[in-house]
């Protein structure tokens, strides 16, 4: 990523027949706004590849949102061949933290986890 942090706002259309989401320019039936913020928390270069580790906060939760918003800007996720990555392997997308208000106790519950020590995660953790 060129910027250390930022906010991405796009209009997305999900084609259910292809199971693929596209960034579009105009509002029409089925198009939804997608918003996320990101912060680069790590950067590595290996074998000529420049990789960034990002902390992402979704303001909306659209199908393939993270994948398509970054790919549309030329930054496909590692291993995400559907959205333009030339690298084979598992998609490098991991939910490190999730929190929510428990409906029974009405208290905030938080879970943290690091990814397994496999490529590309082993470069950062």
Language-model regions: role of each:
Residues 1-125:
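RNA pseudouridine synthases
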């Amino acid at each position: 990523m060129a910027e250390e942090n930022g906010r991405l706002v796009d209009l997305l259309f999900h084609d259910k027949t292809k199971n693929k989401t596209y960034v579009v320019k105009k509002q029409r039936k089925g198009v939804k706004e997608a918003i996320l913020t990101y912060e680069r928390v790590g950067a590595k270069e290996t074998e000529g590849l420049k990789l960034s580790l990002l902390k992402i906060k979704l303001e909306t939760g659209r199908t393939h949102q993270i994948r398509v918003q970054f790919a549309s800007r030329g930054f496909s996720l590692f291993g995400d061949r559907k959205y333009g990555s030339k690298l084979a392997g598992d998609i490098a997308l991991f939910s490190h933290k999730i929190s929510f208000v428990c409906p029974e106790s009405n208290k905030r519950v938080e879970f943290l986890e690091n990814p397994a020590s496999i490529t590309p995660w082993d470069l950062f953790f």
